[in-house]
Each structure stands twice: as C-alpha cells, then as structure tokens.
Amino acid sequence: FFPIIAGMAAKLIPSLFCKITKKC
C-alpha cells in the first residue's frame, strides 16, 4: 500500500512543483 502512495507522490510532487514554479 505505502509504496504505491510513495510512487504516486514521486510523480505528482515534481509536476506540481513544475506548474507552480514554471521550472521543469
């Protein structure tokens, strides 16, 4: 269960950071 959440966060957080800061 936890690895799935961690995997999703690993993909989600960078994309959110990219959208917010406009740095990809």
Curated annotation (Swiss-Prot):
Tissue: Expressed by the skin glands.
GO annotation terms (biological process): defense response to bacterium; defense response to fungus; killing of cells of another organism
Cellular component terms per the entry's GO annotation: extracellular region
Disulfide bonds: 18-24
Major location category of this protein: secreted
Protein keywords: Amphibian defense peptide, Antibiotic, Antimicrobial, Cytolysis, Disulfide bond, Fungicide, Hemolysis, Secreted
Location(s), subcellular: Secreted
Glycoprotein as UniProt keyword: no
Top-level taxonomic group: Eukaryota
Role summary: Antimicrobial peptide with activity against Gram-negative and Gram-positive bacteria (MIC=13 uM against E.coli, MIC=3 uM against S.aureus) and fungi (MIC=6 uM against C.albicans). Shows hemolytic activity on human erythrocytes (HC(50)=7 uM).
Family designation: Belongs to the frog skin active peptide (FSAP) family. Brevinin subfamily.
Protein name: Brevinin-1SPa
Organism of provenance: Lithobates septentrionalis
